[in-house]
């Protein structure tokens, strides 16, 4: 746990058009020291909602699950050693 009372874990949430789910998902991981929404070019309000909730946002076009996740792990500068990947729904 860090000085803010949050757990030293980075949460990565891959999304695409998850406006119905992203708010509740972000509320559920509010305990984490870092929350990143990894968006696949959503055309709905996913990014707006994530931004309002204080999540960091990284966007990248989706190619396939494996490459997308591996790209995130290799290219995003996470604040914590532990990374939890959570579906928005």
Which role fits each region the language model picked out?
Residues 8, 33-34:
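Residues at the starts of beta-strands that form the adenosine-phosphate
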Residues 61-68:
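A short, glycine-/small-residue-rich helix N-cap motif at loop->alpha-helix starts
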Residues 23, 44-53:
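Acidic helix N-cap motif at the loop->helix transition within catalytic regions
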Residues 70-82:
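Active-site nucleotide-sugar/metal-binding loop of Leloir-type enzymes
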Residues 28, 39-48:
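A conserved acidic beta->alpha catalytic loop
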Residues 1-28:
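N-proximal low-complexity "stem/linker" segments adjacent to membrane-targeting elements
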């Amino acid at each position: 746990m860090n000085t803010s009372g949050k757990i030293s874990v980075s949460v990565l949430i891959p999304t695409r058009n998850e406006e119905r789910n992203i708010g509740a998902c972000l509320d559920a991981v509010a305990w984490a020291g870092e929350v990143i929404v990894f968006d696949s070019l959503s055309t709905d309000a996913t990014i707006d909602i994530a931004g309002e909730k204080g999540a960091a946002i990284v966007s990248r076009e989706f190619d396939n699950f494996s490459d997308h996740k591996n790209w995130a792990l290799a290219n995003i500068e996470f604040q914590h050693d532990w990374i939890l990947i959570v579906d928005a729904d």
